[in-house]
Amino acid sequence: MDQTSLILAIESSCDETSVAVIKNGDIILSNIIATQINSHQRFGGVVPEVASRHHIEQITICIEQALKQAEVRKEDLDAVAVTYGPGLVGALLVGVSAAKAFAFANELPLIPVNHMIGHIYAARFVKPIVFPALALLVSGGHTELVYMPTENEFKIIGETRDDAAGEAYDKVGRVMGLKYPAGKAIDELAHQGEDIFKFPRAMEHEDNFDFSFSGLKSAFINTVHHADQINEELSKKDLAASFQQSVIDVITAKTVRACEQLEIKQLILAGGVAANRGLRDTLDKELGEKFNHLDFVKAPLDLCGDNGAMIGAAGEMLMRHQVFADMTLNADPSLEFDWEPEAIK
């Protein structure tokens, strides 16, 4: 008889309070998400103190709703998984504190999950991850290529040297007068415009897998400011298309080069910006033309943003590898990706 595992998973690293119940690492029984976007829009970005207060208000409600929707009792659970970094320290502390209290009260093991590993493991809800694999993580705080030779081994082979792609989207969106978060709006505008501004593609042809988006951001801002000074009206659609094409060209070039140089069986696209239609379509086309053997797995659109389900998927894998934490677990806002799971025990 197959053994069943049930994990309560908690995510609170930024501006989403999310709790999920995950069965066997790849079946979602519930995935409650309390978003704070409306509270942060007027500030043009996430305010850490506001985020923390919202998490405090929502965390116990989300836990109760997740269990109720999953029709799972506390005594049915096998473990509690929680994001402990990277992220906003105050926000992380709410989730970590709640997870520790729940685990202690119900005598359950506690699984510490790196938020970025969670994003990668959202792919489990599409199909099993096959190793060796490469993950392209594109989000508000990270743009990374992560090589995974085997399960629970993570090696960053390329990362942004300045702004993350998602961060650049939000800053450019602010200049365009778009609401935060601006990624979806820019993507929609881009599909209606043309790449007429030919913004720079930083590091596109350099012999490495690193990214840089600060120069693109500056070029975009300078173009808009110059137009304002001479009372020239620029097309938002063309601005969005030009900006997005620059981002996509660089990300695609680096990813394709990595796939050519590494012997991998699967490429995973994950993170908030992984929901971008332009990026998904371009990678589909480029990879389809260049590789016959490569399995390209895109995280489900509704699981690209922060959510508890992905933490549960990663948590189940870590549980099988006996990665647990005790009640001294603390939030680590600057948690690095090149980590040694054994050191957490």
UniProtKB/Swiss-Prot annotation:
Reaction catalysis annotation: L-threonylcarbamoyladenylate + adenosine(37) in tRNA = N(6)-L-threonylcarbamoyladenosine(37) in tRNA + AMP + H(+)
Family annotation (CDD domains): ASKHA_NBD_TsaD_bac
UniProt-annotated binding residues for Fe cation: H115, H119, D306
Cell location: Cytoplasm
GO cellular component: cytoplasm
Coiled coil residues, start to end: none
GO molecular function: iron ion binding; N(6)-L-threonylcarbamoyladenine synthase activity
Pfam families: TsaD (PF00814)
Cofactor(s) needed by this chain: Fe(2+)
Main localisation: cytoplasm
Group of enzyme by EC: transferase
InterPro entries the UniProt entry points to: ATPase_NBD (IPR043129), Gcp-like_dom (IPR000905), KAE1/TsaD (IPR017861), TsaD (IPR022450)
Annotated binding of substrate, by residue: L137, V138, S139, G140, G141, D170, G183, D187, N276
Keyword rRNA processing: no
EC numbers, comma separated: 2.3.1.234
Keywords carried by this UniProt record: Acyltransferase, Cytoplasm, Iron, Metal-binding, Transferase, tRNA processing
Keyword Zinc attached: no
GO BP annotation list: tRNA threonylcarbamoyladenosine modification
NCBIfam families given in the database record: gcp_kae1 (TIGR00329), T6A_TsaD_YgjD (TIGR03723)
PANTHER family (UniProt xref): TRNA N6-ADENOSINE THREONYLCARBAMOYLTRANSFERASE, TRNA N6-ADENOSINE THREONYLCARBAMOYLTRANSFERASE, MITOCHONDRIAL
Family: Belongs to the KAE1 / TsaD family.
Entries under HAMAP family matching the protein: TsaD
Its job: Required for the formation of a threonylcarbamoyl group on adenosine at position 37 (t(6)A37) in tRNAs that read codons beginning with adenine. Is involved in the transfer of the threonylcarbamoyl moiety of threonylcarbamoyl-AMP (TC-AMP) to the N6 group of A37, together with TsaE and TsaB. TsaD likely plays a direct catalytic role in this reaction.
Protein name, entry field: tRNA N6-adenosine threonylcarbamoyltransferase
